[in-house]
Amino acid sequence: YTSLDPVLQEEAEEACAEQNARMAGMGPDLESALVAMEPETGLVKAMVGGRDYYESQWNIATQGGQPTGSTFKVFTLVAAIEQGIDPDTKIDCTSPMDRPGAEPLENFGGADYGIQTIENATALSSNTGYYRLTEEVTPAAMNEMATRLGVGGEFVPNNTPTAVLGTENC
């Protein structure tokens, strides 16, 4: 018995192939992976572990220890909402963002989004906006939310705002 849905599996494979095509030329080791789960049951409905498991014998989705990328932004968002911060609240998404003692922080491609609502910052996946929001809600609240929502295993929280940018390996 498998919980995989053949239609969703095909769509997942197509989505990853399209993403891999978009990333072509951006770096030799870039490839996408995807896991789609049914929230009510935790059953895996679709999974793509990379370009070709038979070639690499490596499933990025299950064996990865990969940086979390922008996925931690959702934990900051939920922590913010729980703290009473409305998604219509404005947040500074300008780029680059100076940080004392650290390299300037930029949005992907150096994009300067200006002032945005948190909702728009989420749609844009603004690194600078979410860094600032994480400072406001606290990295500890973001990590606590991640744990409450099921991030576990070898996850060791990094209680710095950069964790929202994908500096954690899970």
Give the ranges of each region predicted by the language model:
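A short, well-structured edge-of-sheet supersecondary motif
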Residues: 28-54
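A short, polar/charged loop-to-alpha-helix boundary motif
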Residues: 52-64
